[in-house]
Amino acid sequence: METSWKNALANEFEKPYFESLVRFLHEEKAAGQKIYPPGSQIFNAFDLTPLQQLKVVILGQDPYHGPGQAHGLSFSVPEGITAPPSLKNIFKEIESDLGIKMSGYPNLENWAKQGVLLLNAVLTVRAGAAASHSKIGWEQFTDAVIRYVSDNCEGVVFLLWGNFARTKKELIDATRHHVLEAAHPSPLARGAFFGCRHFSKTNELLLAQGKAPIDWKL
């Protein structure tokens, strides 16, 4: 994990729940279970978005569980993998909101490198089994991440899409940060994601703070 995050979260790594979580992952591997993303990419979101560069948080639920999809960034898949339906809808909203044409390139690393923390609440999953690693400790860890950002950063824009992400609102100090809410971009979700205009709104909020806007185009 990137140094600024490792230092910020040092206390979490020492806690019994995290030791239990690591033990669980070792036991899964020992039992022959395939885990996504690969071990080197579990903390990819932190590695690509150092704490001092953080401007935006996009919160997802848990990693994609299909072969080759998960690479440690919420909603993102590596190049060469077809964009999942939620990501396609995100691109449609960007096109509508910003009046630009997206290439369909599904790897969101360029956003991460500009200060967008693409954080899943759960950072691993068993192959082919959605939400199989929920309730093993990851939520406690990523809640601590959100709390740390809330307490130690200023003016971060949190994009909370869907009912699960919205439950994290209580961890965020809305007097110091900006919280934008919408329905989940999944085609199966109820409510309005289209028309939320979160991408232009995020940039307006960043510019108002004298921060560089995010180039959302891919």
PLM regions: where:
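A polyanion-binding, active-site-adjacent surface
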Residues: 2, 11-160, 164-167, 172-173, ...
